[in-house]
Amino acid sequence: VHAKNRPMKKHEEICVFSEGNTLHEGQSINRMPYYPQGLIELPKNTLRRTRNDAGDNTVMSKRKSHKETICTHTNYPTSILKYDIEMNEDRFHECQKPLLLCEYMINTYTEEGELVLDNCVGSGQSAIACLKTNRKYIVMDNKEKHILTTKNRIEQFKEIN
Protein backbone atom coordinates (compact mmCIF):
# COMPACT_ATOMS: atom_id res chain seq x y z
CA VAL A 1 0.00 0.00 0.00
CA HIS A 2 2.72 2.50 0.97
CA ALA A 3 5.59 1.16 -1.19
CA LYS A 4 5.40 4.15 -3.55
CA ASN A 5 5.35 6.64 -0.67
CA ARG A 6 7.97 5.41 1.80
CA PRO A 7 10.24 2.45 2.52
CA MET A 8 8.33 -0.70 3.40
CA LYS A 9 8.53 -1.77 7.04
CA LYS A 10 10.34 -4.99 7.86
CA HIS A 11 10.12 -4.66 11.64
CA GLU A 12 7.38 -4.34 14.19
CA GLU A 13 8.12 -3.08 17.67
CA ILE A 14 7.07 -4.87 20.81
CA CYS A 15 7.49 -2.66 23.87
CA VAL A 16 8.56 -4.15 27.18
CA PHE A 17 7.96 -1.99 30.24
CA SER A 18 9.64 -2.56 33.59
CA GLU A 19 10.43 -0.67 36.76
CA GLY A 20 14.04 -1.68 36.24
CA ASN A 21 16.61 -0.54 33.70
CA THR A 22 18.99 -2.34 31.35
CA LEU A 23 22.31 -1.24 32.83
CA HIS A 24 25.05 -3.83 33.27
CA GLU A 25 25.01 -6.02 36.35
CA GLY A 26 26.83 -4.20 39.13
CA GLN A 27 25.90 -0.77 37.76
CA SER A 28 22.32 -0.84 38.97
CA ILE A 29 20.42 -2.30 41.90
CA ASN A 30 17.11 -2.10 40.02
CA ARG A 31 17.75 -4.11 36.84
CA MET A 32 15.01 -5.24 34.49
CA PRO A 33 14.58 -9.03 34.59
CA TYR A 34 16.05 -10.71 31.51
CA TYR A 35 16.18 -14.46 30.91
CA PRO A 36 17.51 -14.93 27.36
CA GLN A 37 15.99 -17.93 25.57
CA GLY A 38 17.83 -20.45 23.40
CA LEU A 39 21.31 -20.08 24.88
CA ILE A 40 23.85 -22.77 24.09
CA GLU A 41 26.40 -23.61 26.78
CA LEU A 42 29.96 -23.58 25.48
CA PRO A 43 31.97 -26.80 26.05
CA LYS A 44 34.62 -24.74 27.86
CA ASN A 45 34.73 -21.19 29.13
CA THR A 46 36.22 -18.80 26.60
CA LEU A 47 38.07 -15.57 27.30
CA ARG A 48 36.47 -12.80 25.30
CA ARG A 49 37.85 -9.33 24.85
CA THR A 50 35.71 -6.32 24.06
CA ARG A 51 35.48 -5.98 20.28
CA ASN A 52 35.95 -2.72 18.48
CA ASP A 53 34.01 -1.49 15.45
CA ALA A 54 36.53 -3.05 13.08
CA GLY A 55 35.46 -6.49 14.30
CA ASP A 56 38.86 -7.66 15.52
CA ASN A 57 39.66 -8.56 19.11
CA THR A 58 41.60 -5.46 20.07
CA VAL A 59 40.36 -3.78 23.22
CA MET A 60 38.39 -0.59 22.58
CA SER A 61 39.93 1.47 25.37
CA LYS A 62 41.72 1.26 28.68
CA ARG A 63 38.59 2.11 30.70
CA LYS A 64 37.77 -0.06 33.71
CA SER A 65 34.38 -0.92 32.22
CA HIS A 66 36.04 -2.60 29.22
CA LYS A 67 37.45 -5.67 30.92
CA GLU A 68 37.99 -9.06 29.38
CA THR A 69 35.13 -11.38 30.23
CA ILE A 70 34.63 -15.12 30.43
CA CYS A 71 32.04 -16.30 27.91
CA THR A 72 30.06 -19.36 29.08
CA HIS A 73 27.22 -19.35 26.52
CA THR A 74 26.56 -18.47 22.90
CA ASN A 75 23.46 -17.94 20.73
CA TYR A 76 22.29 -14.84 22.58
CA PRO A 77 19.12 -13.39 21.01
CA THR A 78 19.26 -10.39 18.70
CA SER A 79 16.68 -7.65 18.27
CA ILE A 80 15.16 -9.51 15.30
CA LEU A 81 12.85 -12.43 16.11
CA LYS A 82 11.26 -14.43 13.29
CA TYR A 83 7.99 -16.29 13.82
CA ASP A 84 5.43 -17.49 11.31
CA ILE A 85 2.10 -15.71 11.50
CA GLU A 86 -1.02 -17.77 12.07
CA MET A 87 -3.22 -17.67 8.96
CA ASN A 88 -5.83 -20.30 9.85
CA GLU A 89 -8.80 -20.86 12.14
CA ASP A 90 -6.60 -19.74 15.06
CA ARG A 91 -6.50 -16.19 13.69
CA PHE A 92 -8.87 -13.98 15.68
CA HIS A 93 -7.47 -10.48 15.08
CA GLU A 94 -5.87 -8.64 12.15
CA CYS A 95 -2.78 -7.69 14.21
CA GLN A 96 -2.50 -10.98 16.09
CA LYS A 97 1.00 -11.94 17.19
CA PRO A 98 2.11 -15.58 16.95
CA LEU A 99 1.47 -17.49 20.18
CA LEU A 100 5.07 -18.76 20.22
CA LEU A 101 6.32 -15.15 20.07
CA CYS A 102 4.12 -14.21 23.04
CA GLU A 103 5.43 -17.20 25.00
CA TYR A 104 9.01 -16.26 24.08
CA MET A 105 8.58 -12.66 25.29
CA ILE A 106 6.89 -13.75 28.52
CA ASN A 107 9.61 -16.33 29.26
CA THR A 108 12.34 -13.78 28.46
CA TYR A 109 11.13 -11.05 30.81
CA THR A 110 9.23 -12.81 33.62
CA GLU A 111 9.45 -15.80 35.91
CA GLU A 112 6.66 -18.26 36.70
CA GLY A 113 3.98 -16.72 38.90
CA GLU A 114 4.78 -13.13 37.91
CA LEU A 115 2.29 -10.68 36.42
CA VAL A 116 2.02 -9.65 32.74
CA LEU A 117 -0.03 -6.64 31.57
CA ASP A 118 -1.36 -6.38 28.01
CA ASN A 119 -3.29 -3.14 27.53
CA CYS A 120 -4.23 -3.95 23.91
CA VAL A 121 -5.24 -7.59 24.22
CA GLY A 122 -6.79 -7.97 20.77
CA SER A 123 -7.08 -11.72 20.22
CA GLY A 124 -6.03 -12.79 23.71
CA GLN A 125 -2.71 -14.31 22.66
CA SER A 126 -0.88 -12.86 25.67
CA ALA A 127 -3.45 -14.29 28.10
CA ILE A 128 -3.18 -17.76 26.51
CA ALA A 129 0.62 -17.52 26.57
CA CYS A 130 0.46 -16.57 30.27
CA LEU A 131 -1.72 -19.58 31.01
CA LYS A 132 0.68 -21.86 29.11
CA THR A 133 3.74 -20.47 30.93
CA ASN A 134 2.20 -20.26 34.43
CA ARG A 135 2.03 -16.46 34.70
CA LYS A 136 -0.69 -14.19 36.04
CA TYR A 137 -2.13 -11.65 33.64
CA ILE A 138 -4.15 -8.46 33.37
CA VAL A 139 -5.55 -7.80 29.91
CA MET A 140 -7.71 -5.00 28.57
CA ASP A 141 -8.89 -3.53 25.31
CA ASN A 142 -11.09 -0.62 24.25
CA LYS A 143 -13.21 -2.83 21.98
CA GLU A 144 -15.84 -5.09 23.54
CA LYS A 145 -15.53 -7.67 20.74
CA HIS A 146 -11.84 -8.22 21.59
CA ILE A 147 -12.64 -8.66 25.27
CA LEU A 148 -15.33 -11.22 24.42
CA THR A 149 -12.98 -13.08 22.06
CA THR A 150 -10.34 -13.19 24.79
CA LYS A 151 -12.80 -14.42 27.43
CA ASN A 152 -14.01 -17.18 25.10
CA ARG A 153 -10.47 -18.26 24.25
CA ILE A 154 -9.48 -18.37 27.93
CA GLU A 155 -12.53 -20.50 28.76
CA GLN A 156 -11.80 -22.88 25.88
CA PHE A 157 -8.14 -23.16 26.89
CA LYS A 158 -9.06 -23.95 30.50
CA GLU A 159 -11.57 -26.63 29.38
CA ILE A 160 -8.93 -28.38 27.28
CA ASN A 161 -6.10 -28.08 29.80
Where are the model-predicted features located?
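Core catalytic lobe of class I
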Residues: 1-149
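Short, conserved SAM-binding/catalytic segment
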Residues: 151-161
